């Protein structure tokens, strides 16, 4: 029978988690609702990460030790809001630091806000589909209202753009100046799976 274990009142979230597979499906636009679902899934799967396992998995007679099972994230998205991307990234970093590895898989398309999430996986465990298309572009926002509110909005957009660049650089082989150069053309920058490996966005092609 299927058993559901509740730890500290944390229950399996509905979509997008697959508890038995320890997999989170991040498909579609990254919205406030999607961000909340992914964060809930990360925290639930983190709570059930530690299990008894063999010290040497190849030796059935080796001592039993507590091991941390990794979490997998399947990613296929056109992107979404920066604030919800940052909420996912902050929780991913927290889980990696204190509990377990996170394996990321980019399939189909990984664009805009989805790119740092793919790159935020544990180094050596970030994979991308051979036919996956990756895309970077400048932060976008609609402005309106008085000139003062538009100036305020512009300052916020600049801050988000700088933070996006710094964050992506921290996960990859790209420097902030290299990312700014890529984005300088004011257009969408499409990247192949092979280029993503060279840039350090992912580690392996599947």
Segments (PLM) and residue ranges:
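Terminal-region recognition feature
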Residues: 1-206
């Amino acid at each position: 029978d299927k058993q559901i274990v509740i730890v500290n009142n944390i229950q399996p979230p509905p979509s997008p988690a697959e508890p038995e597979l320890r997999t989170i499906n991040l498909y579609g636009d990254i919205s406030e609702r999607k961000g909340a679902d992914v964060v809930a899934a990360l925290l639930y799967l983190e709570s059930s990460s530690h299990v008894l396992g063999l010290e040497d998995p190849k030796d059935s007679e080796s001592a039993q030790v507590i091991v941390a099972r990794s979490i997998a994230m399947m990613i296929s998205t056109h992107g979404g809001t920066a604030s919800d991307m940052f909420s996912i990234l902050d929780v991913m970093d927290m889980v990696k630091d204190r509990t377990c590895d996170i394996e990321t898989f980019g399939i189909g398309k990984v664009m805009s806000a989805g790119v740092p999430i793919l790159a935020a996986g544990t180094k050596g465990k970030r994979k991308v589909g051979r036919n996956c298309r990756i895309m970077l572009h400048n932060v976008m926002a609609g402005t309106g209202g008085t000139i003062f509110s538009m100036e305020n909005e512009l300052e916020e957009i600049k801050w988000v753009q700088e933070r996006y660049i710094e964050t992506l650089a921290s996960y990859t082989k790209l420097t902030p100046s290299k990312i700014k150069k890529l984005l300088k053309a004011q257009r969408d920058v499409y990247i192949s799976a092979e280029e993503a490996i060279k840039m350090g966005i992912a580690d392996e092609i599947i």
